[in-house]
Amino acid sequence: MYSAYATPVNQDQTASSVTVLTEKDFAERNATYVSDVLKTVPGVAMGANGGRGALTSLFLRGAESNHTVVIIDGVKMNPVNGGGFDFGGLSLSNIDRIEVLRGEQSALWGSDAMGGVIYITTKSGLYKDKPVNLDFDIGTGSHGTVDGSATVSGYNQGFYYSLHGDSHHTRGISALSDREFLYKGRNGAQYRPSFLGTERDKFHRDNASARVGFDDGKKGVEFLTSHSSQTMRYDSYFDAKDGMNDYKTRIRDTLYKFSGYLGSDQDLFKHKINLNRFKTDNKDYYGRYTARRDDASYQLDFNFDREGDIKQSLSLLTDYNKSRYLGSEYNHKLKLNEKSVALEYRLLSEEDHSLSISGRTINNSQYGHAFNARLAGAYRLSPNFRLHAALGSASQAPNVAEYFGYSGYSIANFELKSEKSRGGEFGLLTQTSDKRHNLDVTYFARNVKDLISDQIVSCITPTWCTYQAQNMSGTSHIRGVEIAYSGQLNDKLNAYANYTYTAAKDSSGLQLIRRPKHVANGGLAYKITEHWGSDVNISYVGKRVDDNKHRYQMPSYTLVNLGVNYQLSKNLNIYANLNNVFDRKYESTVRYGQDGRNVYVGLKGSF
């Protein structure tokens, strides 16, 4: 477990609510993109502005989409302009593991972690069984979808490397829905589209990465670089006759990272450094922006109690962040610098008891000072029962668009304050003695002050308005319950199921948009024979509200996906997925279409 503490720990010792997903879970849940598998996790709700590749936002435990930090290989990947991470184009082809850490995490991960952390680890080549390994995955499906990826990696006497490339293309569906949905809104308002989507909105993404390093367990260094390029078409609310119904966004992301460590968890001291640069070049109909974030961090682990069943340690973390942003909507370059220092104390027991206390102070050149803390603990009552609880605070600085405005559609507000959250959770994990069955029930709650929301300043037409980001008065309240089960029913049958209830209301008592009260997921994976396997997955998303102005009521929907796979040989596996089996027509965001019934077939190999 890499996300819950400053150092890796066993999942059984973690006090926070966290879900771990591996390649086995990706396959059993019919997932080809990160968004496919994340939506099956407790506490997660997602909204997409169209089909594959379209802007896709994640809402974790009722938090805003930009309140969840996304970490890939130890690097914060949230947009430099401060918006929420877009999961629409992120493929699983090079991903080894995903951790979804829920709750206030700013004490460890800084700003952007008010709702939690999505921690993603890609394939590194470290500890591979031979010097040269080849992994590939090719697939094709409905809507002219074609995917391909290949990874060459290896490990020998401490040295390791990984070279990866992938490409994804789909002719797609219309981003604007091609079907008419009628929604009722505030004060009897009704929404019925004046026109429907007609053309397909294509999506294409290419990605390449290279990694080389050395690790002997006592010391290690690594260099990682990656580059991705994606182009996606999307639609606007305007009629086709205005010539504005076919938009395109092109995004180029480049990452350079150098990291190293000296010492082990059994040594008194362990040192870690991390230097990285993340660059973005984004061009769309409205304009273009380039951004760069440079980050330098140092961590010192002090393992002062290393003997016996109980181990104690301290970690000191320092971080310096420098961001630069230049957009066509501004006449000058925006510069932000941030310095932070964090301290974490950990007590871990061989009997799965744990206690952690952490705090972080942040000083931002534009938004000032913030301090956040977290207390988390777990106690195993017996081999079958374990209590876990956490309390924490978090903060979220305004993003660039909120603070400085954007392209005349949003007015600057230099009086904005950072959003602040205080919350906690309490849960009970029940396990069988052999840990083949696990049931976790967790209650969570948070209060958010100074929540930032776009407010209408003026309107030229009913659909063309000028906005300004403002801090809402009062306190927003979020309460909920997560129930999650995972189990091995027998040697051939695995199952998972989860249900999340979320009551997310603003200071006026109105439900926050795009947060369904009820979400449920479940699935079975069955090993039919030595070569044949199958799976079925069901997802339910309850009623929710969209559009702050009109507050349209959106109905619930249920999706069923089926999968089958066949082991051709020791090294080759063919699989086929039938998604949205009953061809359910629905929208996750008002006005934007989603895939109906669709098929995907692929071949995986490992040599």
Segments and roles (model prediction):
Residues M1-A27, S65:
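Short, acidic, small-residue-rich periplasmic hinge/interaction motif at the N-terminus
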Residues L90-D135:
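A beta-strand signature from Gram-negative outer-membrane beta-barrel systems
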Residues V75-E104, N413:
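Short acidic/polar hinge/loop motifs at secondary-structure boundaries
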Residues S35, K39-V75:
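Extracytoplasmic beta-strand/coil segments of soluble accessory domains associated
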Residues Y119, Y127-D129, D135-G139, V146, ...:
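Periplasmic-side early beta-strands and strand-to-turn transitions of outer-membrane beta-barrels
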Residues G213-Q230, Y247-A370, R374-R380, N438-Y443, ...:
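Face-selective signature of the C-terminal outer-membrane beta-barrel domain
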Residues A240, N245-S259, G263, S365-Y367, ...:
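Outer-membrane beta-barrel signature, preferentially recognizing the C-terminal barrel domain
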Residues D352, A445-N447, Q470-D547, N573, ...:
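Gram-negative outer-membrane beta-barrel transporters
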